[in-house]
Amino acid sequence: MASSQVGDMVNGNAEPTRHLAKFPPSLWGDRFTSFTLDKQLWDKYGNEIEVLKEQVRSMVVAGGRKAAEQINLINVLERLGVSYHFEKEIEEQLEQLFAKFEDNEDYDLFTIALHFRIFRQHGYKMSCDVFNKFRDSNGEFKETVSNDVRGMLSLYEATYLKIRGEGFLDEAHAFTIAQLESLVGGPHLSSDLSEQVMHALKQSIHRGFPRLEAKHFISFYEKDAARNETLLRLAKLDFNQLQLSHREELCHIFRWWKELDLISKVPYARDRAVECFFWSTCAYYEPQHSVGRAVLTKIVLLLSVTDDTYDAYGTYDELKLYTNAVQRWDASAMDELPDYMKTLYRALLNVYDEVERDLAKQGRAYGVHHSKEAFKEIVRSYEIEAEWFKEGYVASFEEYMKNALVTSTGRLHTTSCFMGLEADVATTEAFEWILTKPKMVAASGAIGRLVDDVMSNDEEQERGHVATGLDCYMKQHGVSKQEAIVELYKMIENAWRDINEEMLKPTAISMKLLIHVLNLSRISDVVYKYVDGYTHPEIIKDHVISLFEDPIPM
């Protein structure tokens, strides 16, 4: 992804012409430099949370509740963002509920669709046939469905769990979107329900950032006349306590980044410490993953600057030197680099050394080698794109995607994310699984790459950039830009289908690992949905503030 440049000089006196990207600066100044955790408030939250957790745990395991009531309780716990406290109990309940499920029960559309979504989210392959009773003899939706707003909203959310070959869910997706859009703001919806529908159409549950979606749902749930005050109280306390933890972690990361002072030496690069921490918090938000969030943030930051070096600054000759240095991964390779690259290379080696030391204390350093190898692979693929740009070469779409699945960083992000998990979860076998190039990791990478290609195409081509997947597809198939975008979005949807299918039991590896690959995929949907929100951080600024600064009123 090298930007346009003239005069490949490394050691000559003349500075080569560089076509800089002129990325927007950081939005945050010193906003996150200091933060003092209120220990008294933390303890107050924690003490009440422990009491409420036991009350809720008793609710989850209590007998005598109808299946529909139990599945609704599980849904509320998940949407409130507190289900991670009760994972074992919820899995036991779902196993029993799925084994006993009878589709001849007189369930309405809301309840059937809710069962479908919850079961699929947890790896149980419920058949689409459960929706047949809502279709007429011609296969069309019955008129009663169009009048059931809650049912349509539930079905809409369920369609995001589709896998390949489920044409009905594609039809249901298009149908529910059209119906719900026609009802928003109309006289047939209460303002509260209309607000829920509008949010769902903007961001689905399955593809959303769990912590942000929990905060949204809490605001809806507290207006629900049927709300459970214990659940609501626990959700608010849990969100606010975890927000304090995240804010403290962000402060440490932000100060570390300022002290590293890399951006002052490579000012062409995007300064995105806060956004990278936001990214890492999407990968895993739970309190036990604080080390993982720090590790992943640091690696993503270094990758971001490396990407910008290949994409928007380095000359081809400089980039070849840097690629070779990264393959050697040795401080002595620094001597061959221009000064600005020495700074970046030194930071890369030091950060990985620091990460390895931190993880070694917990017996988890074995994943660092895999992360380094993934970083080396990405840099090799960056150089391939730099060569293509230098030669004006437009690859076939297939050739482009083969390389793009590396530069999409799916392997590096997954490996680096696994490094931050508990040793009994992210075992050596988990890292070996990544080396097999599993379908789920490839699909996650494809989503990120193709969405980014569509959203950043105009801006990148304006400044000079290697042909993107959009350009390659247009040239190979002789189609317009809009036609190519339609085809790329079909590929993105198929990649989501693959992710959903890989999460159905029996899974290749533990669901405790796969959920983080899913979370990494969700980042693409949240950050790149309408525009490149990483390059243009004002797009996700409200998300950052909501997650790290604004507590929920108690």
UniProtKB/Swiss-Prot annotation:
It comes from the Eukaryota. Specifically expressed in flowers. InterPro entries: Isoprenoid_synthase_dom_sf (IPR008949), Terpene_cyclase-like_1_C (IPR034741), Terpene_cyclase_plant_C1 (IPR044814), Terpene_synth_N (IPR001906), Terpene_synth_N_sf (IPR036965), Terpene_synthase-like (IPR050148), Terpene_synthase_metal-bd (IPR005630), Terpenoid_cyclase/PrenylTrfase (IPR008930). Mg(2+) 3 binds at residues 452, 456, 460. Mg(2+) 2 binds at residues 307, 311. Pfam families: Terpene_synth, Terpene_synth_C. Its EC number is 4.2.3.174. Transmembrane segments: none annotated. GO terms for biological process: diterpenoid biosynthetic process; sesquiterpene biosynthetic process. Disulfide bonds: none annotated. One of its GO terms (molecular function) is magnesium ion binding. Pathway: Secondary metabolite biosynthesis; terpenoid biosynthesis. (2E,6E)-farnesyl diphosphate binds at residues 270, 307, 311, 449, 452. Binds 3 Mg(2+) ions per subunit. Its cofactor is Mg(2+). It catalyses: (2E,6E)-farnesyl diphosphate + H2O = (2E,6E)-hedycaryol + diphosphate. Mg(2+) 1 binds at residues 307, 311. A motif (DDXXD motif) lies at residues 307-311. Keywords: Lyase, Magnesium, Metal-binding. Belongs to the terpene synthase family. PANTHER family: ALPHA-HUMULENE_(-)-(E)-BETA-CARYOPHYLLENE SYNTHASE, OS04G0344100 PROTEIN-RELATED. The Asp-Asp-Xaa-Xaa-Asp/Glu (DDXXD/E) motif is important for the catalytic activity, presumably through binding to Mg(2+). Sesquiterpene synthase that catalyzes the formation of sesquiterpenes and sesquiterpenoid alcohols. Converts farnesyl diphosphate (FPP) to hedycaryol. Hedycaryol is likely to be one of the terpenes that attract insects for pollination of Camellia brevistyla. This is Hedycaryol synthase. It comes from Camellia brevistyla.
